[in-house]
Amino acid sequence: VNGYPSRDVICQDIARGDAWLVTGDNGDAVGYFVFRPGPDPTYRHIYHGAWLNDAPYHVIHRIAGRPHVHGIFDAVMRHCQAAQTDLRIDTHRDNHIMRHLIAKYAFIYCGIIHTEMGDERLAYQLAATP
């Protein structure tokens, strides 16, 4: 969206081994996301709430997909839930589609975090075990 993530950011994700592709039935890349173990520096401070626990976690960032391709978030979640760890994710307040998808998978709203650029994001956590 608006040039983010940039090519440089994607190259850094790949170099760290954190980048994942979602492929369609024909093998074409239809989506992209980052999945990596925490701690994530932007999740160190949370405001107007608290994380569910201090358990080890993985973060999901930069979910992007081709327009009009459905099921990308479902594929991301199949991959991430296989890690059997707590998951943390954040999104912009105005990203209603992502907020709906996050709620669909029973993530719990935990509070507000700020990105490295200082932008506010809604932060969520899904505990691996209740």
Model-derived segments and their meaning:
Residues 1-11:
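Conserved GNAT-fold acetyl-CoA-binding loop/helix
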Residues 7-9, 45-52, 110-111:
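Short, P/G- and charge-enriched loop/turn segments at secondary-structure junctions
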Residues 16-35:
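Conserved beta-hairpin
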Residues 23-25, 125-129:
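Active-site beta-strand termini and strand-to-loop segments that position acidic
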Residues 34-68:
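Conserved acyl-donor/pantetheine-binding loop and adjacent beta-alpha core of acyl/acetyltransferases
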Residues 59, 82-94:
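Conserved GNAT acetyl-CoA-binding A-motif
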Residues 65-82, 99-104:
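Conserved acetyl-CoA-binding loop-helix of GNAT-fold acetyltransferases
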Residues 90, 106-122:
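Conserved catalytic-core motifs of GNAT/GCN5-like acyltransferases
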